[in-house]
Amino acid sequence: MASSPGNTNPHNTPPFDLGILFKPSSNPYPPPAASYPPPTGPFLHNQYDQQHYAPPGISAQPSPVTQQQQDVSSSSAATNLHPQRTLSYPTPPLNLQSPRSNHNPGTHILALLNNTNNGAPVANQEPSHQLPVVNHNEIARSFPGGSGPIRVPSCKLPKGRRLIGEHAVYDVDVRLQGEIQPQLEVTPITKYGSDPQLVVGRQIAVNKVYICYGLKGGNIRVLNINTALRSLFRGHSQRVTDMAFFAEDVDMLASVSLDGKVFVWKISEGSEGEDQPQITGKIVLALQILGEEDTKHPRVCWHCHKQEILVVSIGKHVLRIDTTKVGRGEVFSAEAPLQCPLDKLIDGVQIVGKHDGEVTDLSMCQWMTTRLVSSSVDGTIKIWQDRKAQPLVVLRPHDGHPVSSATFVTSPERPDHIILITGGPLNREMKIWVSAGEEGWLLPADAESWRCTQTLDLKSSTEPRAEEAFFNQVIALSEAGLLLLANAKRNALYAVHLDYGSSPVGTRMDYLSEFTVTMPILSFIGTNDPPEEPIVKVYCVQTLAIQQYTLDLCLCLPPPIENMGLEKSDSSVSREANLVEGMSEPSGLKPTDLPSVDSVPKPSIIVNRSESANKLSFPSAEATSQAIVPPNGEPKTSGLPSQTSGAGSAYATLPQLPLSPRLSSKLSGYHTPVEAIEPVIPHHELGGKTPSADYSVDRQMDAVGERNLDVSSVEEISRSKDSNVTPDDDVSGMRSPSAFFKHPTHLVTPSEILMGVSSAEASITTEDRRDRDANIQDVNNDPRDTEVEVKEISEARSTQNGEINDHDETENCTSENREKVFCSQVSNLSTEMARDCYPSTEGTFIPGESKAYGQPIKAGDESGVDSRGGPAKLLKGKKQKAKNSQGPGLSSTSSNVANLADSFNEQSQSLSHPMTDLLPQLLAMQETMNQVMASQKEMQRQLSNAATGPIGKESKRLEVALGRMIEKSSKSNADALWARIQEETVKNEKALRDHAQQIVNATTNFMSKELNAMFEKTIKKELAAIGPALARSVVPVIEKTVSSAITESFQRGIGDKAVNQLDKSVNIKLEATVARQIQAQFQTSGKQALQEGLRSSVESSVIPSFEKACKAMFDQIDSAFQKGIAEHTNAAQQRFDSGHSQLAHTLKESITSASSVAQALSRELAETQRNLLALAAAGANSGGSNSLVTQLSGGPLGALLEKVEAPMDPTTELSRLISERKYEESFTSALQRSDVSIVSWLCSQVDLRGLLAMNPLPLSQGVLLSLLQQLACDISKDTSRKLAWMTDVVAAINPSDQMIAVHARPIFEQVYQILHHHRNAPGSDVSAIRLIMHVINSMLMGCK
């Protein structure tokens, strides 16, 4: 099936050919051909009966144990004999599966479906197929709700391959020596006739209660894991491409389909009257995105902490949907969802960004919830931030080829340990990306850069085209540290282990394990539920069924450090040391009398948490093999050379290998190979009660890990006389420690940001053994303790508990050698590793557990006395050895246990000794019990001394880490603040220079151009007005003077002389008079009129305009400068004060928390000592244990947990901030909670009107705008008070402020619409509403 390079899904998908998916691969170990459902015979035998395994050479012959059981009990032969399945590949080493408790949801739901679906028709959307039913004659064990399900365990141990270097290549067709690809343990859930299509996306979603998967027509099937109730959700009209639950404990399901429909379902159960409960799905959101026609795989992604926010990709667009705003007040319908075109988005839907090609995957960062990554077929991934139209980062991770997946992965140890994993075409090439900053830590910034640290390339050497060999689906399980890839073309599942390291840049893919499945996986999802078991449950949509595979985490981890030296230097294959345990064979033991092996406990898990180096370590998954006797009767063993002790037991020891300095600071662990060869007490002998498996927890302060030891009950010797007992009465099981990967969804607090360590976890597990047994209480220590090497002390348990390992047929007991290897490493120290190897004999006594039992031995137990030797004499010798070896350390207790176990092994080889010979043994047992108690007291004293050092060391480490972090944060904040101040100062200086230059240019232009023209125009106008006035004043005077002069001249003389002089006289007088009059008139009236005209013209036109222009210009410059400087100074001061006050407060809280934890640990340690002393004094009194359980349950640790888990009242913190006059911080904290009741309470605690009247304002414009919006959203409650507050707030808002310029208009419009809906309020409120609406309208007009 070819796939175009521009799309991860095939174009124009033809009818799917199942032959392609089931095409045999070139795997040298092909999976067995199996039809659905898988054969049940051999695997049910492995799961629920005592295991009888035939080696490869004699697989077709009945085993000796089977023959023996046929002779002993013919009634149980039909139960125990199952034909071994013939495999088409070499039989792997023995893999003994331990029986699990019924935590498997697939097991439970299948059993319930078998009862609820008998004879009931199935809806036409889901093909009707009968689920496999198990015959009750084959399984004598009862299950709740009906017959047991089919659970097919894995038949061989995996052997993976190490991934070394920055570019690792894994060829799926090449098998190195020793590599094994087993089939996974599978539990069918339901038969399913799917429409096989190879497309990306999650077609199945699982949480703690429900399993949801899509059907052909777009409907969604919902199954209750616990009750097997079923329901069908209808709404999608085409295939569902993606679905996801908000969280594992929240029943909110989001789904999206090809037709662009987005649904959010709130799943609930209820019943009407006495009817059977029904599953119902309330539609929280029904939306159809229009505008993208050719969409292949829409995706959906929840916000990490907000149930009302989800992100959806439709075609090339990435949308953010707020379910509280979309269709507010409307009732959604599945038949008619709300329409939302991309070119005209409705309220509550906004576009985050867009790609050039279709979006293939979405992922949101849990730590920094403003970061969202999207991948596309255009070859890019883009990292988006809230409220920014452009992406922060655009990467082309796979050289421009389509990107099929992009996922943020967060370390479970540190929430700020973030990496990005991308997948190329067909998810064949996987890359790890980290931030390019120091050590890869992701810090808030406006621009980012990422770099690739490692690449994993999957290739096929037999297929020339990658499309014919690969189509991988990818999921990342951050808590388990796994990256799972399901290859539908090869029926394979690849588990890639992630080693997080001490920093993001140190994260590596270091190990790859391959598993085979029976049919192609079309889509899958993984969970860590139940948290008690170190397993991952993978729920798969396959071509013929919905199935659940169980993946043991210990099978996906690289070998421990001890086995590093066994690897070849020229290959990447990891080789583990085989631990071989020999069996002591007394003279009376026949080769055909080998005891049957019921189960081998899976290796336990150590979780070591440290701030400097986060480690997740697992012991190696090593199967301890017995000596297998071939037909010729010669026992053979394989493995390392063994040394034979004096008793004839062979102990396999690990070679002392050099440790890798590079790995010494990252991995620490131990492994405990155990053979469980103990029969168990029949069910009817326990008084009708089902016994729960005993286990003990070894506390180790350096790794703070937990180890499970499967402690089975012992079958009494008289069992052979009871014909009603069958081997199927075995109901023992193994229980795992408390959850390792349980991380519920939570909101990140500032202290978590600074400290980077998770809160303390403690759990108390009690287990009721039998009516007369004492209760055992195991308390898990705080996983953050520092590493201190503490010796393990093995304690002996009294054999009066009826736990003597006898076999009623062989008359002997096989002693078992246990080797414990304890490796301890201190963080950041890679120079040395301490090993403590010691052998101990495991028989009746269980390390780490002490029980007192006062019930006398029954008469039927007399057969346990050895007739071939003097028991009193042997006991005396053992007693003397126990006295000589008694001491406060590890060797004394282990030797006591070994000697006592040897004595019982020797005594149990005879069945004819009288009862009276057991009395010395009882006395010796009592004395040994006292020695064990003394050793216990010494161990407690050593633990007390060892606990003080770790607490002090942890306090110092915490202090140093906090100091470094605070110093680094303060320095970065100060540098950023100083850089911002300098930048703003430079900007202001540049603006001032620009304004001054503009003023100079304007003044120059005015003086050179406009002033001359205006002055000339004014002069001309005034002269034109002065001329007529001057003529009117001068002409009458001239006329009068001329007439008077003429008259005078005529009067003086007549004649020639008079006439001659008349002309001269008239001219002289006329000139003098005219000149004098003109001068006088001009000096008096003309000059004054000219000056007044000029002055009035200049004053009326030139000077006012010039003064007005200059004043306006200078006022604008001054106001802008003063405002900018004031706002910048206030913002810088507030940011500086808030940053330092927050750091100081966080530091104070961190120190207080650390002190309280240290005090609680000290008190708990003292209480533990007192309780253990009380237990020793109580002896065989079972009532004392009950009181101890009561004391421990109500002890200081429980009170501390209740104190830690109690939620903090936000009003207390807000009151403190108000008392300190930190109004900005208090309002910001209240508004960020998105709780209007808290905001209203805060407004009522302060004088908001007086606060807003201060100068400068103590609240920033952003806080005021947010306060206005939140008060408006809850205006229906306490309307009058909120309107008064809104009136004061809206009067203080400056819409031209650059801080809120982008957000002011949409928020004003929203508030205006809310007030518009409340216009019909009472009369006293109408005026306030209109006033606020008028002010908002004015601001909106000013914002245009």
Curated annotation (Swiss-Prot):
**What are the record keywords, sorted?**
Coiled coil, Cytoplasm, mRNA processing, Phosphoprotein, Repeat, WD repeat
Q: Which residues fall in a compositionally biased region of kind Pro residues?
A: 27-41
Q: Name one GO molecular function term.
A: mRNA binding
Please indicate if the UniProt record lists Transmembrane as a keyword: no
**Residue list for modification Phosphoserine:** 98, 660, 692
Q: Where is the composition biased (Polar residues)?
A: 1-11, 616-627, 884-896
Q: Which residues are annotated with the PTM Phosphothreonine?
A: 86
Q: What induces it?
A: By auxin.
List the effects observed when the gene is inactivated. Answer: Lethal phenotype at the seedling cotyledon stage that are small and chlorotic, with disorganized veins, swollen root hairs, and altered epidermal cell morphology as well as leaf and shoot apical meristem defects. Altered RNA decay. These phenotypes are suppressed at low temperature.
Residues annotated as region Disordered?
A: 1-88, 616-649, 711-735, 762-815, 845-896
UniProt-listed GO biological process terms = cellular response to auxin stimulus; deadenylation-independent decapping of nuclear-transcribed mRNA; leaf morphogenesis; mRNA catabolic process; mRNA processing; post-embryonic development; primary shoot apical meristem specification; root meristem specification
Q: The organism sits in which domain of life?
A: Eukaryota
Query: Which residues lie in Low complexity bias regions?
Result: 59-79
How does the record describe its quaternary structure? Homodimer. Component of the decapping complex. Interacts with DCP2.
Q: Which PANTHER family match?
A: ENHANCER OF MRNA-DECAPPING PROTEIN 4
Please state what the protein is called. Answer: Enhancer of mRNA-decapping protein 4
